[in-house]
Design a protein with these regions (language model features):
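N-terminal ligand-binding lobe of clamshell/alpha-beta domains
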Residues: 1-258
């Protein structure tokens, strides 16, 4: 048996060799499968990528509620969770029966660490190293952007991405400044007045979890005359394997910021 520590410093003991992994986070499931892992035996109903592979993997509930019977039936040797995506109660419940590795991703560097960690846990280290290298090189080729940008993810109330979040770290890596980090909380509720005071150059309206679309432009544009309203694909702000697609995505939408 091997003793390891997860991203929260929790100690767990796992068996050596191939694992039977249940992933409770969509970005983690996608990354494991994109790395070529054959170890994933269970996923949440929200783990929908890569589509051609996940449909053959058993569903064990959602990210906030789990089907314990389905999990026990799969006889996993390792469960991988994520601090923000899954609840403490889920982790504690499952940890009474199985090793549960909890990942934590709050920065771009954390995302690279996640890929490396998954490579180790699923015995696909070489693929993980290669993916990290490819992502870093692709991002390095992007022209630097600049300006104040707020990423709006919810409506009624409006909620924005704030401090100590992967999305803010990604925006900063691209060259933006996120003034919402001055507010309390990681995903603070914001008003139009808050956005006005932030002196924004860009308002990024995400496609998820709330599906902002063109019809919502009028809620912002008349009140933020100096800011450009840009609709962005929320899936491109996932961490893990999706970062490679994200780098290409940001390259294709460069003109929207000019």
């Amino acid at each position: 048996m091997t003793t390891i520590h997860d991203h929260l410093g929790r100690q767990l003991v796992i068996q050596p060799g191939p694992q039977r992994i249940i992933s409770l986070c969509p970005a983690i499931t996608e990354t494991l499968l994109e790395l070529g892992s054959k170890s994933v035996v269970g996923r949440t109903k929200y783990c929908i990528f890569p589509q051609e592979i996940v449909e053959d993997i058993a569903v064990v509930g959602g990210t906030k509620t789990i089907d314990e019977a389905a999990i026990h039936a799969l006889n996993p040797t390792l469960i991988i969770a994520e601090k923000e995506e899954n609840t403490k109660e889920i982790v504690e419940t499952l940890a009474a029966h199985y090793p549960v590795f909890v990942c934590q991703v709050e920065t771009v560097d954390d995302a690279y660490r996640l890929i490396e960690t998954l490579g180790t846990l699923a015995s696909v280290q070489q693929a993980a190293v290669a993916l990290i290298d490819k992502i870093q090189k692709t991002f390095a080729q992007l022209p630097a952007l600049s300006g104040n940008a707020a990423y709006i993810m919810w409506r009624k109330p409006y909620m924005a991405v704030g401090k100590t979040t992967y999305i803010t770290s990604l925006l900063e890596m691209l060259g933006f400044t996120n003034p919402i980090t001055k507010l309390d909380g990681r995903y603070p509720a914001v008003t139009i007045e808050d956005l006005q005071q932030a002196k924004l150059d860009y308002v990024l309206l995400s496609s998820e979890p709330f599906p902002f679309s063109e019809k919502h432009r009028a809620e912002f544009e008349p009140y933020l005359a100096n800011a450009k309203i840009i609709f962005v694909d929320g899936e491109m702000f996932w961490y893990g394997a999706r970062m490679l697609k994200a780098a290409h995505y940001f390259n294709t939408i460069q003109q929207a910021f000019n």
